[in-house]
């Protein structure tokens, strides 16, 4: 059976606020070189008029035309609007969180509900049409949109329903994590979500879902009770541990490979107290000492304590320059207990900056009083970036030495960050095969990223970051698909480990034609 609505309905409204973290972008090749990006379909229509033959792009990246009659039939069958390039609202609908990606879909289906999603998926499959799915539009690689294809846009689907007594929530696929946090925190409940309030719950959850509460309550997928999902055949299915359990296993960590999730049902936990959160920044000369102190403390830390260590070349220190620091989230009931746990880190000396304090969960998440903000216009001034990620299963001194040396060698013209965030706790206690998320035993999730706006420096900066990554990669195993969805097949296989063959079987069963391919793609074997 499908997830049924509760009697209590939310009054959530769309939010498009830009988070504090910098724009990140994984390298992604053009989907269709045969057609000039954005132009053919952008010029193909006048407002409100459907051309007799609409130029689009196929799944194979080749030119494809679709008859006006087919488009009219789709539009008539949708409750939400179907937008072409010159229709009112098209430009705002196609924009993503990262303005570096200036995609122009031929069609945008602004879905009003699961029935619209099913019709859009059936249309795409029938025509062999390149298809992108937008939940929150926060994809680091821009895969929430596509040039010349169909964008299935879940942004209008914002309903959130909370069962306070049963401690569960159902949220539609267009909800942002800040919206869900505010709704659940209003009654003193929470579940594991990410750390950027403008992230969509859909992509976050399907890739695993790391966040401040994961060491005590597990990943987002560990708190997922069921989903409603439209698979590639256009059917709306319910998936849980008792209904379509194979599909439910696959979507918990397998990303968007198996369909479009229209509803997520989460387990909620009591959380109505202050938590300890913030960071301390030190001179770069103390980088090795910071690494050593943090990893030593983390090795014996209770589940309530989560630590991270980061190298930064931005403007965190006076006059800019390199710095090293640690970040903390203590989710226990008493922040003073967290302060006592941090005493070994205080021995590092007086920091250049200290933001650690007792705050509400919403404040830590950046969702407290968050206001709407316009998504920036894409264009030539949009930033470029290079991002690589991986999991650390050990932290030898040689790793610290390599990180410090490689990071210091990066050009001063590319603001960069290298951060390793603690895992473990409830994440590691589940079996590696219980869900598709394989890297549960990892000690840390690592990210290296540089971002710049002078596009004339693209080649030099990417080369420098690649050289830095070349020295670090040997210490990693697999990667987090939500931060690097465009990685090569070899790394993808390492990411899913022994779960990969089973995921391929699920892909063969639920999406044998690889309709859902704009993701960390698990290709069908057929």
Segments the model singles out, each with a brief description of its role:
Residues 2-526:
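Soluble FAD-dependent oxygen oxidases
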């Amino acid at each position: 059976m499908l997830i049924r609505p509760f009697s209590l309905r939310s009054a959530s409204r769309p939010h498009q606020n830009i988070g504090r973290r910098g724009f990140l972008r994984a390298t992604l090749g053009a989907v269709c070189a045969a057609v000039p990006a954005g132009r053919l379909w952008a010029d193909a229509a006048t407002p409100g008029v459907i051309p007799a033959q609409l130029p689009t792009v196929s799944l194979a990246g080749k030119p494809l035309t679709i008859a006006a009659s087919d488009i009219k039939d789709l539009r008539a069958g949708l409750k939400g609007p179907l937008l072409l390039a010159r229709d009112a609202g098209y430009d705002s609908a196609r924009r993503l969180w990262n303005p570096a990606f200036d995609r122009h879909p031929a069609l945008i289906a602004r879905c009003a509900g699961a029935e619209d999603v099913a019709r859009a998926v059936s249309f795409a499959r029938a025509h062999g049409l390149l298809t992108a799915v937008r939940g929150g539009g926060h994809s680091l690689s821009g895969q929430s949109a596509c040039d010349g294809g169909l964008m299935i846009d879940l942004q209008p689907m914002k309903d959130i329903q909370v069962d306070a007594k049963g401690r569960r929530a159902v949220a539609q696929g267009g909800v942002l994590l800040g919206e869900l946090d505010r709704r659940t925190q209003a009654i003193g409940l929470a579940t594991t979500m990410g750390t950027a309030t403008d992230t969509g719950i859909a992509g976050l959850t399907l890739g695993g879902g790391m966040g401040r509460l994961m060491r005590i309550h597990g990943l987002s997928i560990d708190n997922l009770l069921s989903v409603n999902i439209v698979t590639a055949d256009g059917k709306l299915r319910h998936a849980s541990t008792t209904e379509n359990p194979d599909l439910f296993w696959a979507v918990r960590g397998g990303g968007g490979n198996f369909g479009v999730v229209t509803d997520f049902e989460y387990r909620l936990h009591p959380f109505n107290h202050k938590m300890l959160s913030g960071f301390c920044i030190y001179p770069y000369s103390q980088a090795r000492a910071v690494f050593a102190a943090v990893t030593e403390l983390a090795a014996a830390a209770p589940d309530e304590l989560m630590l991270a260590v980061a190298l930064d070349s931005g403007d965190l220190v006076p006059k800019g320059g390199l710095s090293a620091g640690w970040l903390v989230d203590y989710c226990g009931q008493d922040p003073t207990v967290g302060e006592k746990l941090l005493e070994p880190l205080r021995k590092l000396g007086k920091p250049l900056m200290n933001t650690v304090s007792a705050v509400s969960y919403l404040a830590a998440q950046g969702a407290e009083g968050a206001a709407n903000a316009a998504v920036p216009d894409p264009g030539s001034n949009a930033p470029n970036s290079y991002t690589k990620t991986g999991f650390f299963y050990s932290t030898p001194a040689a790793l610290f030495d390599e990180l410090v040396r490689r990071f210091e060698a990066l050009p001063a013209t590319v603001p960069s960050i290298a951060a390793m965030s603690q895992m473990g706790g409830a994440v590691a206690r589940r079996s590696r095969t219980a869900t598709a998320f394989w890297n549960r035993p990892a000690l840390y999730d690592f990210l290296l990223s540089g971002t710049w706006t002078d596009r004339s420096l693209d080649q030099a900066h990417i080369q420098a970051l690649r050289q830095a990554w070349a020295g670090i990669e040997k210490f990693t195993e697999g990667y987090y698909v939500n931060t690097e969805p465009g990685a090569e097949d070899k790394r993808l296989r390492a990411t899913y480990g022994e779960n990969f063959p089973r995921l391929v079987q699920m892909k063969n069963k639920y999406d044998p034609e690889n309709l859902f391919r704009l993701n960390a793609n698990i290709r069908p074997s057929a």
